Amino acid sequence: MIINAKGPASFAEKYIVRSIWDNKFPPGSILPAERELSELIGVTRTTLREVLQRLARDGWLKIQHGKPTRVNNFWETSGLNILETIADLNPEGFPVLVDQLLSARTNVSAIYFRGALRYNPDTAVDVLAKIHQLEDTAESYAEFDYLLHHTLAFSSGNPLYVLILNGFKGLYSRVGRYYFTSSDARLLALNFYKELELLAQAKNYLDVPALMRTYGMNSGKMWLQLRDDMPASIAQDN
């Protein structure tokens, strides 16, 4: 098992998570005793305890006082905060993970975009006005796209959408910077922003879902053209 880590705690965390992912520690199984596991990994027991507590908070493990530590089925117990970890664990499956991420974000964003234009159209107008000074670079488009989603999610009347977006942030930002290296992708997005701006100015929230569906389909087709050339390094949070 080859693990790149910045310190003992990082190494221990990656070792345990990789072992769970590879079914060395399968769901429902009991982790080795603390002393045995610390010797196996090569870290102090104090460091190991801190790592186990962190992994339990993320849903990988179940820790109960006086009982051995049990491995969870992380698909059932973890949240969006492990997306980065899954991307790092399974680089071969990263393109599929991104497909699923983009599909989920498209479906959810249709709800909070509509809500923002319904309840806070002036906020939507203000943030969309930034497109007229938007630099034609991948970095600028990726940053603005996240800003737009974050602002409209917060203005939708349901701030929980912001928490969902926060779970996507690191992974989506890296993918976005790659996606927007395409001038065609930037033009497609700019046209979408302009149409959305017109709806916001007219306080027309009813037509938002149709616009989102169209852009979702078109950007999805664009992504399929780009994803095969995506650098493998995007899967890693450097």
UniProtKB/Swiss-Prot annotation:
One of its GO terms (molecular function) is DNA-binding transcription factor activity. Residues 34-53 bind DNA. Keywords: Activator, Cytoplasm, DNA-binding, Fatty acid metabolism, Lipid metabolism, Repressor, Transcription, Transcription regulation. SMART domains: HTH_GNTR (SM00345). Residues 6-74 form the HTH gntR-type domain. GO terms for cellular component: cytoplasm. Transmembrane segments: none annotated. GO terms for biological process: fatty acid metabolic process; regulation of fatty acid metabolic process. Its main location: cytoplasm. Gene3D superfamilies: GntR ligand-binding domain-like, Winged helix-like DNA-binding domain superfamily/Winged helix DNA-binding domain. It is found in: Cytoplasm. It comes from the Bacteria. The keyword Transcription regulation applies. InterPro entries: FA-response_TF_FadR (IPR014178), FadR_C (IPR028374), TF_FadR/GntR_C (IPR008920), Tscrpt_reg_HTH_GntR (IPR000524), WH-like_DNA-bd_sf (IPR036388), WH_DNA-bd_sf (IPR036390). Multifunctional regulator of fatty acid metabolism. This is Fatty acid metabolism regulator protein. It comes from Shewanella baltica (strain OS185). The lineage of its organism: Bacteria, Pseudomonadati, Pseudomonadota, Gammaproteobacteria, Alteromonadales. The gene is fadR.
